[in-house]
Design a protein with these regions (language model features):
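Generic detector of low-complexity/intrinsically disordered segments
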Residues: 3, 7, 16, 107-108, ...
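A generic structural micro-environment signature
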Residues: 7, 20, 77-80, 111-112, ...
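Residue-level marker of positions within ordered structural domains that often coincide
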Residues: 14, 91, 137
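Well-ordered beta-strand positions enriched in small/hydrophobic/aromatic, beta-favoring residues
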Residues: 9, 97-98, 122, 132
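N-terminal (or domain-start) structured segment
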Residues: 22-118
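Surface-exposed loop/turn and secondary-structure junction residues enriched for glycine/proline
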Residues: 17, 84, 108-113, 122-125, ...
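Short, low-complexity disordered leader/linker segments with a strong preference
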Residues: 1-34
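A conserved helix-loop-strand patch within extracytoplasmic ligand-binding domains
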Residues: 120-143
Length: 143
């Protein structure tokens, strides 16, 4: 369980699609059409910005074979609508990514039958460090 918690506490990019794509010739996946990337957090939030930035880097570094990455935000049901869509996708599953963050864990585990086992972790894109800041006008320098 600790391994699962550590994995989901990091902002992770997950995908379904465990093979079977016609694009696989030598065991490596090479996209030949647009990639859909689902973000279950609100537009403009940290996960959304991070998802779009990583997508921009993947495009700039030609890691997606010149294909377009389309980010879609599905926040309904605390993100469960988007997570469930990706988890149960049959068609074009190789072209669907999902940003999963630590805020997605508890609603998923407490309220649904959907579990991390329904996804395949492709990359851990960041590990959050918790930082505490104070404003410049604060009376004290430290706690």
């Amino acid at each position: 369980m600790a391994t699962v918690l550590a994995g989901v506490m990091a902002v992770s990019m997950l995908a379904t699609g465990c093979g079977g794509s016609k694009d696989i010739k030598d065991g490596k996946f090479t996209p030949s059409k647009s990639i859909q990337w689902m973000c279950t957090s609100s537009a403009g939030g940290g996960s959304d910005i991070f998802t779009r930035k990583i997508g921009d880097i993947m495009t700039a570094e030609n890691l997606v074979n010149g294909q377009t990455i389309v980010v879609t935000n599905k926040t309904d049901g605390a993100g469960e609508v988007g997570r469930n869509e990706v988890a149960t996708m049959k068609n074009n599953a190789d072209y669907q990514l999902l940003t999963f963050n630590s805020g997605d864990l508890m609603p998923m585990v407490q309220n649904t039958k959907n579990r991390a086992a329904n996804f395949r972790i492709l990359a851990i894109m960041a590990v959050d460090k918790q930082l505490l800041f104070k404003g410049q006008g604060a009376k004290y320098d430290k706690f």
